[in-house]
């Protein structure tokens, strides 16, 4: 029960932050884990969650999703319980939790986020809500009974799937019929009466509301905006790369997905649950229970396996309907039909699954500590028609952690700039064996990777020497499938692009015999004479 008690105290502080001095602790996931570990030592092995719930339910919260959270997450208080005292925590810990209490985006800065060991930035609030939903071990909550009567229940019969979900079959052409039939309303369906608690609390509600707002203002939602920390060793300030970003930043999506994945894990394992500090240390480290795939580096791949697009669309719709019924005064949701909410849910899910889950995670230049570009970059004329594959050769060993990959990036940039006298690192992108891509010159600047052809294609390099061995499967899948499909969708790469190895155009052994022989079996590979 320690996991419950510690998390309820943290959630209480999240929902009821008190003003005070800024924490001296760096905004690192390790600091959050440290905070949970300290709380776990203070919480007795009792039904502490019931005690804390009374306190949390009485808290004042300015969040627009307060009613959704209370309906799906918080239990009714017991009159026989006493409130936990947050002041028993150290002042430094109180200050840290208050600092990450609410996720927000203001004036180009993002609040309530921390830097994880894998180099990703994570919003704390949706992560902790997902953990709590998982600890409760109930995935489905009923709509409130008073909202099943007039005026909450409109009584509108949704004639068929196409009427309920305009464009859904076109939006998800690869969804199997059984999946669609299992998750979408049938021809007699009415107002949804259940909602997935994990996804509604961590992701679906925010996803739907953000796209609803942007559809009303005719503005794209700016899904997954990245940002830069003021420093990486002891980060304090996170500035977004797009000052017009929506709340669905990369950090928020990371936190929401982590919360859903870990909450799902907690709901399926037997009790007693492991200490949450231990679970987070594994997830943001080598992997939960030693599984190297079940960790934050591969959240997108694991998230894609957690739910299908039609299922997520259904859950986004149900979250919006529930919020509409719980908050009839909500301006965004007034005079909006369920069919319109279904359209928003379809659009939001399509964008999330294709532009986030379906795309590789790319660390921006600031994340690996890039030196400034020397001179003035030449813009590419997009879309390009070629993808050129390299291996770095030196560094020879694959990089398997953010720290080692970032160090390799800085080393290659120094060599390219100081020894070869290039303006910048030559590659467009570099592929680590840690589950991440690293931005070099990126999508818009001409690189220095394939002499004579730099303006015609993107240069992508695997870290390592692949003369006699291959990169890991995750890295290969990224370059073969995720990266080009995402670039095509964004209009950066032509659908009929050609894939070539470096050696086909320049006198070199790059990208190594083993890797090149594999490339020859890939789609879009083209034989040319050097």
UniProtKB/Swiss-Prot annotation:
Glycosylation sites: 61, 80, 174, 335, 465
Domain N-acetylmuramoyl-L-alanine amidase as annotated: residue spans: 386-512
Role according to the record: May play a scavenger role by digesting biologically active peptidoglycan (PGN) into biologically inactive fragments. Has no direct bacteriolytic activity.
Catalytic activity from the UniProt record: Hydrolyzes the link between N-acetylmuramoyl residues and L-amino acid residues in certain cell-wall glycopeptides
Disulfide-bond pairs as recorded: 399-405
Enzyme class: hydrolase
A Pfam family hit: Amidase_2
GO molecular function per UniProt: N-acetylmuramoyl-L-alanine amidase activity; peptidoglycan binding; peptidoglycan immune receptor activity; zinc ion binding
Alphabetical UniProt keywords: Disulfide bond, Glycoprotein, Hydrolase, Immunity, Membrane, Metal-binding, Phosphoprotein, Secreted, Signal, Zinc
Compartments (UniProt record): Secreted; Membrane
Source organism, top-level taxon: Eukaryota
Signal peptide segment: 1-22
The UniProt record lists the keyword Zinc: yes
Protein name: N-acetylmuramoyl-L-alanine amidase
Phosphoserine: modified positions: 219
């Amino acid at each position: 029960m320690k996991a419950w008690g510690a998390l309820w105290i943290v959630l209480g502080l999240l929902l009821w932050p008190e003003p005070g001095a800024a924490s001296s602790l760096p905004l690192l996931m390790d600091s959050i884990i440290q905070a949970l570990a300290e709380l776990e030592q203070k919480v007795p092995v009792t039904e502490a969650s019931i005690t804390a719930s009374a306190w949390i339910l009485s808290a004042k919260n300015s969040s627009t999703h307060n009613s959704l959270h209370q309906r799906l997450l918080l239990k009714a208080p017991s009159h026989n319980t006493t409130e936990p005292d947050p002041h028993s925590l150290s002042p430094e810990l109180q200050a840290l939790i208050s600092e990450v209490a609410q996720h927000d985006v203001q004036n180009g800065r993002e609040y309530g986020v921390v830097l994880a060991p894998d180099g990703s930035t994570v919003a704390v609030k949706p992560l902790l809500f997902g953990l709590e939903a998982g600890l409760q071990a109930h995935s489905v909550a009923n709509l409130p009974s008073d909202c099943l009567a007039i005026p909450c229940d409109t009584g509108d019969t949704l004639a068929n799937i196409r009427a309920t979900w305009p464009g859904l079959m076109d939006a998800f052409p690869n969804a199997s019929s059984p999946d669609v039939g299992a998750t979408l309303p049938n021809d007699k369906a009415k107002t949804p009466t259940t909602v997935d608690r994990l996804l509604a609390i961590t992701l679906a509600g925010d996803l739907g509301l953000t796209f609803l707002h942007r559809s009303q203002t005719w503005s794209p939602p700016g899904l997954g905006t990245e940002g830069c920390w003021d420093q990486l060793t002891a980060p304090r300030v996170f500035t977004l790369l797009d000052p017009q970003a929506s709340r669905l930043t990369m950090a928020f999506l990371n936190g929401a997905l982590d919360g859903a994945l870990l909450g799902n894990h907690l709901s399926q394992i037997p009790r007693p649950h492991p200490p949450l500090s231990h679970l987070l240390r594994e997830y943001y480290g080598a992997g939960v229970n030693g599984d190297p795939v079940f960790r934050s580096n591969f959240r997108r791949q694991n998230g894609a396996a957690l739910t299908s697009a039609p299922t997520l669309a259904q859950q986004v719709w149900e979250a919006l309907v529930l919020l509409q019924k719980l908050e009839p005064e909500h301006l965004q949701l007034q005079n909006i039909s369920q069919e319109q909410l279904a359209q928003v849910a379809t659009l939001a899910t399509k964008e999330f699954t294709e532009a986030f889950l379906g795309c590789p995670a790319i660390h921006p230049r600031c994340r690996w500590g890039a030196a400034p570009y020397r001179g003035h970059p030449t813009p590419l004329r997009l879309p390009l028609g070629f993808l050129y594959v390299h291996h770095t050769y030196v560094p020879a060993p694959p990089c398997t952690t953010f720290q080692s990959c970032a160090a390799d990036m800085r080393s290659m940039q120094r060599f390219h700039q100081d020894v070869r006298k290039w303006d910048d690192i030559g590659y467009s992108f570099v592929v680590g064996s840690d589950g991440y891509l690293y931005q070099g010159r990126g999508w818009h600047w001409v690189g220095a990777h394939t002499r004579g052809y730099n303006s015609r294609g993107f240069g992508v390099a695997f870290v390592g020497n692949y003369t006699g061995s291959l990169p890991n499967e995750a890295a290969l899948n990224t370059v073969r499938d995720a990266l080009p499909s995402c670039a095509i969708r964004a209009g950066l790469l032509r659908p009929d692009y050609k894939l070539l190895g470096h050696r086909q155009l320049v006198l070199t052994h790059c990208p190594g015999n083993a890797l090149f022989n594999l490339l020859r079996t890939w789609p879009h590979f083209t034989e040319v004479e050097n």
